[in-house]
Amino acid sequence: MAWERPLNNSQTPRAKNSSRRSLLPSTASIERCTYQLADGTFVTAEMPDRWMDRSQAGESLVAHVVTSKFCDHLPTYRQVQMFAREGCKLSESTLNQWVMEVGNRLVPLYLAMKAVVLAQCYLQADETTIRVLPEKGNNKKNMKSGTHLGYFWVYRSPGLNLPIFDYQPGRGQECPKAVLRSFSGVLQTDGYKAYDAVARDADGRIELAGCWAHARRKFVEAERSDPKAVAVILRGIGHLYAIEKIIRQKGASPEEVLRLRARARTLLDKARPQLEALLMDLRPKKPLRQAIDYTLKRWDKLLLYTERPELEIDNNAIENAIRPVAVGRKNYLFAGSHESAEIIAQLYSFMAACKIHNVNPTEWLADVLVRLPGAKPSDYPKLFPSNWTKTVHPHEGLSEEFFLDDLEAKPTTEAE
């Protein structure tokens, strides 16, 4: 409460509301399952479902640790320091064990979500690196600074808005081939040659679509050497994105999408001969020539989105899902093993899905760890972050005093 200074001595002071924000230390609680009655008798409540037998760590605690690492990019050693400041002594090995155990228990749910995503007829794909500590006896191939360079291959279903991270030790074409061996539909990529090999060996099952964000990036990189020509090209690409903005704002139907994108197709049909003519006037090593060459080689793939209303103009959504990995690896640096990298890929899949669907990842994980062991495979889709609804547990929100009062009450008998 604050007081305004009166204008004169006869004026009554007037109160006005004021507020300030404070930060309270985090708290941890211990759930007691045994209570003593007034007569000294001990009563033990029925044991609730637990995420891991013989573990004193509750679901909310391990969910907090996992979320802190994969959403907030806090390595476990830093979390140990933070817990210590709050008076909670934990070891880094304990936290790492929890993370691995959580990942292992989520494997059935991850495989179910992966199967659902790969069953769609339109996917986007991209990849990013992860450093992995080598196993004993590994050769020096693909090694740098004593670590192995592994890859997260990421597949996203725009229809479901679900991403899947898949860890592979390399970046060869055999990696996406193994994952996409049963996929049939449109695969949108940045033009990496491994995906061309996947489509070529798929017997017509896979059609490739291009990404205008990657094509635009090539021209941005050439802007310094040919600013005037690049400015014209970037303005033209900007018109394509302006049309997409109109589509999103209108919530356009598939028919309207095709009608609006027909304007984009007209612009592109006019642009191609101009790009081809400009290409002939540029030296081979000029960045602008390389940008035009990249675009023309993928022209049909870049046009495909104008013919299919369900396709997106670029791969930006999957890049947004991947971006937290880049921040995370700057903090925790590497995975401890290939097995750990697989677990990390699974957890990033769920954390990314929670972010996309505005789900609190800590609440989701704590709830799923309890529900998953008793769930049937047919119920797994209900636990995906995209479909999840929070479970209200029987004792949630009831204080310890409630139970004590209830237990201390005198029992009634039939005679009474």
Model-derived segments and their meaning:
Residues M1-Y35:
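Short, conserved DNA-binding cores of transcription-related domains
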Residues R5, I30-E416:
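Catalytic center-proximal scaffold of phosphoryl-transfer enzymes
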